[in-house]
Regions:
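The feature marks proteins involved in alpha-glucan
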Residues: 2-102
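Short amphipathic alpha-helices and their capping/turn segments at secondary-structure boundaries
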Residues: 61-68, 114-122
Length: 180
């Protein structure tokens, strides 16, 4: 019956929280809430972070690309993991948001890879498959080969930790997503 809010004067950075709702006399599972913007591993708990610390250098001056004519737009659809995971991609941050920030990468055959390859093709816009926090990849077991396109959302407002270099730190996934 509406939206409930609460405010706390203290800076509780580094703390986590969940909500638990009782519906028709039954307690439902704990949830980080639909408006969570930062979460812990696997999105089970909302995190309180200082979002200013997630801004990469120059973030406040970042501008979107200018589009002259829609006819000049060349779009490439991609998945974070697929784009960079190959063992000969020459990309350091394979399967991560940061893979899309690496320049000068080459395959073992000397061919351009990553962003440089897209530029070489004339691509000027990228459509990235779901980046939000989703259920099917266990962020605490990234050494295990897991894969999903991300169409099983958990937290729509939070980048998925499996694409970050540290899924245990809620701020890292946000900062690396912004860097991308």
């Amino acid at each position: 019956q509406g939206t409930w809010t609460a405010s706390v004067a203290d800076k509780l950075y580094g703390k986590f929280y969940t909500f638990q709702i009782q519906h028709n006399g039954k307690w439902l599972d704990e949830t980080p809430g639909v408006w969570a913007k930062a979460v812990g591993t696997n999105g089970r708990r909302a995190a309180i972070i200082d979002f200013a610390t997630t801004n990469p250098n120059g973030w406040e001056n970042d501008k979107g690309p200018k589009i002259g004519s829609i006819a000049d737009v060349i779009i490439y659809e991609m998945h974070h993991r697929d784009f960079s995971i190959d063992s000969v991609s020459g990309i350091t941050n394979k399967g991560k948001f940061l893979a899309l920030t690496e320049e000068g990468t080459k395959s073992s055959l000397g061919e351009k890879t990553g962003i440089d390859h897209l530029k070489e093709l004339g691509i000027n816009h990228v459509h990235i498959l779901p980046s939000y926090d989703y259920a099917s990849v266990d962020e605490s077991k990234l050494e295990t080969n897991q894969y999903n396109w991300g169409y099983d959302p958990v937290n729509y407002n939070v980048p998925d930790g499996s694409y970050s270099t540290d899924p245990y730190n809620p701020a890292v996934r946000i900062k690396e997503f912004k860097q991308m």
